[in-house]
């Protein structure tokens, strides 16, 4: 029997690892035999350490209104107020340092087919955001997928055009409305 494998995925600006662990949990739950790795990068060494530690307090978990009890049971081992990512999920992640503003980003982290760069670029000034997104786009293999959020719409539009990216419109209105409701 052939084992299905997925090329490494990448999260930039991984913070405490919650997005990367969520992706791993969903992949593992929907494709149990799938072999995959998620490389999670951040510039804050404390956040990298926190993510690699895979342990969260109850408040961190229940601070998110869209998280379900089913997801929590599948993803965490729970002991009192400590929620630890299950070993079978944790084993799919590698945490390390990388800076999206570094022009050698591709040399540091390598090319990728799936990149998540969400909710960190909006902290940057326009020129830095443009440079970061250019560096991120340089990571993309042909036909790669880039998930980006939290960036100025004009910068995103210009760089999407410059890098010949095709915006995904599948269920875009539904996704947008659900995200707005979750933030409310």
Question: What do the PLM-derived regions correspond to, one by one?
Answer:
Residues 1-10:
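Conserved AdoMet
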Residues 11-13, 40:
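Class I SAM-dependent methyltransferase core
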Residues 15-17:
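Conserved glycine-rich SAM-binding loop
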Residues 36-110, 114-116, 120:
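Extended basic-aromatic, gly/pro-enriched interface segments that bind polyanionic ligands
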Residues 130-142:
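A short glycine-rich, Lys/Arg-flanked "PGG" loop and its adjoining helix->strand segment in the class I
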Residues 142-151:
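Conserved beta-strand signature within the Rossmann-like core of class I S-adenosyl-L-methionine
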Residues 155-184:
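Class I S-adenosyl-L-methionine
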